Regions:
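Glycine-rich phosphate-binding loops of nucleotide-dependent enzymes
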Residues: 2-343
Length: 343
């Protein structure tokens, strides 16, 4: 395909921070109407590379092309003026403003003072791409997925034809992820170029048309998603074959070490953040606590460590090795809990 059919491409781009080489001689591009997944392990240089397209960093070497024109992007405003918008993991929104007000705030010139015009144009964008967003709602009332949707609407409002999403599903439920993917497919159908930074292989295979892989800051290559599977992508990421199916034998004669019963924790505002949790942890096993960030994981661990007060009726018993009776942790200080053997 001719180079001018790329919406944006990088040629021999290098970026260093002191003695650390974040990206080395990287050349890649994304086509119009294509969803490109940028894949790599943590620290492989994915976000740094995209931050150069978005105007947050400036390359030490190499060129960035939008269409067939070499461009200089020294700020996010430069990027937006070229039709490039990046949606970061941490949203840049004012909580006490409505969706419409946040969109207006991101604009320059006098148009931002005409909130009705901003609202009407934003509503048309929402209808076109089937966004579920109340433009009059305050940001602090929104779910995480609604805030993310607002960030996407903001860059589309500014005329972005190239969208970069940095780990967009990290804070979403599976249902919210599927809604986001539906929106991304709508944008692709409209001719937008979309780059998704991720390390979730099953999502890469679900949403992308092509996968580009970085390893230790260098471009390894790309592969059409239809020709890829998790084993192939993993091998390209780490440079060798990886066994994805690990057999974990059951512990032999497991011994109870920690037992939680009816654990309820409320926030300072009186909101229940942990509701009647009960489970047992055994020696010789690793117990994973899964869930979207903000669903009580932090409060659970803090309650065990004595850093969170619990509601009446809760019990946390620690069965220390060689001890005849368990130690009740509820009501004990963090120091006493550490001395009991919980770290």
């Amino acid at each position: 395909m001719a180079q001018n059919e790329y919406a944006v491409r990088l040629e021999h781009v290098t970026k260093t921070f002191g003695t650390v080489v974040a990206n080395k001689d990287v050349s890649l591009g994304v086509r119009r109407g294509e969803i490109l997944a940028l894949l790599g392990e943590n620290g492989s240089g994915k976000t740094t590379l995209m931050n150069m397209i978005a105007g947050i960093y400036f390359p030490d070497e190499g060129e960035i092309y939008v269409g067939d024109e070499a461009v200089t992007i020294r700020s996010p405003r430069d990027a937006l003026d070229l039709g490039i918008g990046m949606i970061h993991q941490h949203f840049k929104l004012v909580d006490v403003f409505s969706a419409t007000e946040n969109i207006a705030l991101s604009m320059g010139g006098k148009d931002k003072f005409d909130l009705k015009r901003v609202h009407d144009k934003a509503r048309a964008i929402c209808e076109k791409y089937e966004f579920n967003l109340d433009l009059n709602q305050k940001v602090y009332e929104m779910s995480v997925s609604q805030k993310q949707t607002l960030e996407i609407v903001k860059v589309l409002y500014r005329g972005a034809d190239i969208l970069i999403l940095d780990e967009p599903t990290a804070v979403l439920t599976p249902q919210e992820t599927e809604k986001l993917f539906s929106v991304i497919r709508n944008m692709k159908a409209d001719g937008k170029a979309v780059i998704i930074i991720t390390h979730k292989l099953h999502e890469v295979l679900s949403i992308s048309d092509r996968v580009a892989i970085l390893r230790k800051g260098e471009y390894v290559g790309d592969i059409a998603t239809k020709d890829a599977d998790e084993a192939k992508l993993t091998e390209m990421m780490v440079g060798e074959k990886v066994e994805l199916n690990i057999e974990r034998p059951e512990p032999v004669d497991p011994v109870k070490r920690l037992e939680l019963s009816h654990l309820t924790v409320r926030s300072a505002e009186g909101i229940t953040v942990l509701d009647d949790a009960s489970f047992t942890v055994y020696g010789g096993e690793i117990l994973g606590i899964a869930g979207i960030s903000g669903n009580g994981q932090k409060e659970l661990l803090e309650a065990i460590a004595g850093l969170q007060p619990t509601e009446s009726g809760a019990s946390i018993e620690y069965f220390a090795p060689d001890a005849d009776t368990p130690v009740q942790l509820v009501g004990k200080s963090p120091k006493a809990i550490r001395e009991a053997g919980i770290h």
